[in-house]
Amino acid sequence: MKSDIQELIKANHDFSEERDWDQFHNGKDLAIALSIEANELLEAFLWKDANDVKIEKVSEELADVFNYAFMIADKYDLDVKEIVLAKLKKNAEKYPVEKSKGKSTKYNEL
């Protein structure tokens, strides 16, 4: 049984494959596209109060960011759950609760 994330990755993969777009999806271009979409997400917040954003725009741009992240994971055969949990573990070591709780200080300045 596939996880929700695996289903999303497969749906994204199938969408691209049906259109023969895989030929354009090298790691560099996928990373650039992800960055562009992340900036479009930022644009949804530009010059607005946090409560005045258009949720539909945020939702669409966030979906684009996720889709490109999933495409990169698929391209390099990365297990999304595994890498996210590994990064959370690493961050927990860099930001122990007793030193970082309630602070925005970078780990090397704690």
Give the location of each predicted region:
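Flexible "arm" and connector segments at domain edges
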Residues: 1-110
